[in-house]
Amino acid sequence: MLPVDAVVLDIEGTTTAIDFATSVLYPYARERLPNFVREHRGEPEVAAIMDEAREVGGVWNDEAVVVRMCHWMERDQKVTPLKTLQGLIWEEGYRSGDLVSHVYPDVAPALRAWHGRGIRLYIYSSGSVLAQRLIYGHTVAGDLTPLLSGYFDTRVGHKREVGSYRRIAEAIGVSPRRILFLSDVREELDAAREAGWQTIWVVRDRLPGLAAAHRRVTRFDQVPV
């Protein structure tokens, strides 16, 4: 591998159990979404989310928007206004102590070591930037946000699109060939590699195909940076 100046991390299946969102975060948001909208509808941030959701979903009243959002959640669709609203709901949960994020035991030591060597660390996830900050700010290993230089979500583009990785490289001001991307999803790694990034396939909760085209690790202490 070439030297790296930045490491970009996926969340689910990479730093965090792949089912953390589906078994903990999504049910928490789904149960609370209707009441959250009713209680906070007058707040500018929630009003803007509802306006965006109406445009995306093609519906025009709050009740229909809530139904559409629940439908998006059931289908695990990466719709930006839904992700933003989920983040607000999770924020309440983390602040109240209802939620604590899972990270694998090898993650925090590796992040601290890389950060200590001057490597910049970023998160790229389909979850909103707010949700990402909450996940890493309230982990079983403590607050990891001081180690992170920035966050990217679907507003920069979807994770299987080459252009997303080019935009991230431009945004952080690092040459693509000196950026390392860690993910458990081959299609994301393929897109990052096509953008000129270095890639490592993190194999934790599911096995890659036999024709894996990327270097593989099972733990972060195996990452050669």
List the model feature ranges, each with a label:
Residues 1-4, 149-225:
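Asp-based, Mg2+/Mn2+-dependent phosphohydrolase catalytic module
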Residues 2-23:
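Asp-based phosphoryl-transfer active-site loop
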Residues 15-19, 130-133, 190, 208-209:
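Short catalytic/ligand-binding loop motif for oxyanion handling, primarily in non-cytosolic enzymes
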Residues 18-71:
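Conserved phosphoryl-transfer catalytic core
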Residues 57-105:
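Metal-dependent phosphoesterase signature
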Residues 87, 96-139:
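Substrate-recognition element of Asp-dependent hydrolases with the DxDx(T/V) motif
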Residues 121-167, 171:
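Extended hydrophobic/aromatic segments used for targeting, binding, or gating
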